[in-house]
Amino acid sequence: MQMESQRRDVFYVSDGTAITCETLGHVVLGQFAVQPNEKTFPFVESDEKLSELLKQIQRSYQLHGVKPLVFFSMVIPEMRTRLLQAPAHFYDVLESIVQRVSLDIEMEPAPKLQRSRSVGKDSDTYFDRIAAIEYTLAHDDGVSLKDLDRADIILLGVSRSGKTPTSLYMAMQFGLRVVNYPFIAEDMHAMRLLPEFEFHRHKLFGLTINAERLTEIRENRLAGSEYASNQQCQQELATVEALFRREAISYINTSSLSVEEISTRILERTGLKRRLF
């Protein structure tokens, strides 16, 4: 069995959003030394869209001489049959699970197109999500410290420690209103909590990161700058972590964690409940 890394075309295909296909595909491919060239085809509901998809799968096979990987979810039987005739390896992301659930609960599935998160059916959920995203964007990177009473959580940390992507993920996936505030170089000489945070201590949560990883991230943004130097990163992290300990603020190290893992660990540590599923 091959162990060295290989490149492979990967298609995520659905007659819905294809988000489930992408999510499962990323998890599965993360177990292998594969460098995926990914293409997503959502809402494949017409012959025209399916024909274009089949052309791209065929082109991939002819160009590389190996079958691409296709993670898919298709409800319409005729379109599913046509898709499976293409030169590819296919992985139905729901079939085995749906069949098992059907057997366990003794009920036949009734699949429908785009069933999940319909705006008409779940309008309250939809608008809650939008409100959470808007609030989080308005409070990103210390832009605003107004309306902190509406925040579910306030993330603190040095610049580039993962606050913004974590905030947006928690807003989009969990419906949480997230504030994030960066401590910058000018804060290090007299590190303290802002007065605005004193009444919201129970919402504070810190993110930290290894100095080597932080240096690497900052070098990609501002190579050769003092901001990106390992010495500066070490100093900022030591100062901020000392603040977290002094003020009894819970924090985690994000160095080897994905955004999904960071967000889930925050929920676990704080006891926050998801508003959306």
UniProtKB/Swiss-Prot annotation:
Disulfides per UniProt: none
UniProt keyword annotations, A-Z: Kinase, Nucleotide-binding, Serine/threonine-protein kinase, Transferase
Residues that coordinate or bind ADP: 157-164
Keyword rRNA processing: no
Pfam families: Kinase-PPPase
Record-linked InterPro entries: Kinase-pyrophosphorylase, PSRP
Keyword Transferase attributed: yes
Catalytic reaction equation(s): [pyruvate, water dikinase] + ADP = [pyruvate, water dikinase]-phosphate + AMP + H(+); [pyruvate, water dikinase]-phosphate + phosphate + H(+) = [pyruvate, water dikinase] + diphosphate
HAMAP family reported in the protein's UniProt record: PSRP (MF_01062)
Membership in a protein family: Belongs to the pyruvate, phosphate/water dikinase regulatory protein family. PSRP subfamily.
Free-text function comment from the UniProt entry: Bifunctional serine/threonine kinase and phosphorylase involved in the regulation of the phosphoenolpyruvate synthase (PEPS) by catalyzing its phosphorylation/dephosphorylation.
Name of the protein described by the UniProt record: Putative phosphoenolpyruvate synthase regulatory protein
